[in-house]
Curated annotation (Swiss-Prot):
Disruption outcome: Does not affect ferriaspergillin production.
Pathway: Secondary metabolite biosynthesis
Organism field: Aspergillus flavus (strain ATCC 200026 / FGSC A1120 / IAM 13836 / NRRL 3357 / JCM 12722 / SRRC 167)
Its biological purpose: Part of the gene cluster that mediates the biosynthesis of aspergillic acid, a hydroxamic acid-containing pyrazinone with aliphatic side chains that originates from leucine (Leu) and isoleucine (Ile). Aspergillic acid has antibiotic properties and was shown to be lethal to mice.
Name listed for the protein in its UniProt record: Aspergillic acid biosynthesis cluster protein F
Highest taxon of the lineage: Eukaryota
Induction remark: Expressed during the earliest stages of maize kernel infection.
Length: 83
């Protein structure tokens, strides 16, 4: 059985990952989307997480904006550094 990678674990694995580090792995359209993610979107809908006030562009904020892009970023970063 494969280990499960959860959202908190992703935050621990890539706490310093930002749009600048991820940008090279995506097309310009995808990067434009990532750069416009609202880091407080979840909080404004009544939810609260400790990471709601992280700087825009962190992996947790990308995750909240589009989980598919966050997973792709994590997998591409891992592939680049561990192949």
């Amino acid at each position: 059985m494969s280990p499960t990678i959860t959202r908190p674990l992703i935050g621990q694995l890539c706490p310093l990952t930002n749009v600048g580090q991820i940008a090279e792995t995506f097309s310009s359209e995808e990067v434009s989307f990532v750069e416009t993610v609202d880091p407080l979107r979840h909080a404004s809908k009544g939810g609260h997480h400790d990471d709601d006030n992280l700087p825009q562009g962190t992996l947790n904020n990308i995750w909240r904006g589009n989980p598919v892009i966050a997973w792709a970023a994590l997998l591409r970063i891992a592939h680049k550094h561990f192949r």
